[in-house]
Regions:
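Iron-sulfur cluster-binding cysteine motifs and their immediate structural context
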Residues: 1-11, 27-46, 56-71
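Short cysteine/histidine-rich metal-coordination sites, predominantly Zn2+-binding motifs
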Residues: 15-21, 45-50, 70-81
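Cysteine-rich micro-motifs
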Residues: 51, 55
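Conserved AdoMet/S-adenosylmethionine-binding subsite of the radical SAM
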Residues: 76-178
Length: 179
């Protein structure tokens, strides 16, 4: 199975880099003050436990392929940023999609606050979800969301358990509630 946005699966910042474009020059390992980047067989290896996200490997990468991804935003700041695109939402009939990792597994209060703020601004909200979360999380946010985009990987329960690791009954049951 494949995730269409794997760069957004974690809730904290992390270093991301394009291994195919890496030349193996080793600059990232040389400049890392914490020894988090080492070279193994001509390729950089990152020890996430040692990485302090200082950004030196990103800044000194000769190929420009390292990047710190993920950023925490207070609700007000995020909504203010999203409202910069209001003209596009109005012209296209679109809105905001919360996606990546599993939005519904995040803090319910945080997601609910974003949803309420966008509803107040009359901006359409879609949430991309796998749907594998308790119904109560959906129940609280339901009045503020226009669309739930269910990312169902496999319909067959046995294959779903084999490939994803969990049964898909909860996912399918919740998707029927929102139809």
């Amino acid at each position: 199975m494949w995730c269409h946005n794997p760069e957004t699966q974690r809730f904290e910042q992390e270093i991301q880099y394009d291994a195919e474009k890496c030349t193996g020059c080793g600059v990232c390992a040389k400049v890392c003050p914490n020894g988090a980047v080492t070279m193994e067989d001509g390729r950089p290896k990152l020890d996430k436990k040692l990485c302090k996200l200082c950004g030196k490997c990103e800044n000194f990468c000769t190929q420009g392929i390292r990047e710190i991804v993920g950023q925490e935003y207070p609700v007000k700041t995020l909504v203010k940023e999203l409202m910069k695109d209001l003209m596009f939402y109005e012209q296209s009939g679109g809105g905001v999609t919360l996606s990546g990792g599993e939005v519904m597994a995040m803090s319910t209060d945080y997601v609910l606050a974003i949803a309420k703020a966008l509803k107040k601004e009359e901006v359409s909200l879609t949430i991309d979800t796998c749907g594998y979360v308790p119904y109560e999380k959906f129940e609280a946010i339901l009045p503020y969301v226009d669309t739930f985009l269910y990312d169902v990987k496999v319909m067959d329960p046995e294959l779903h358990k084999q490939y994803i690791g969990v049964d898909n009954k909860l996912i399918l049951d919740l998707s029927l509630i929102h139809i």
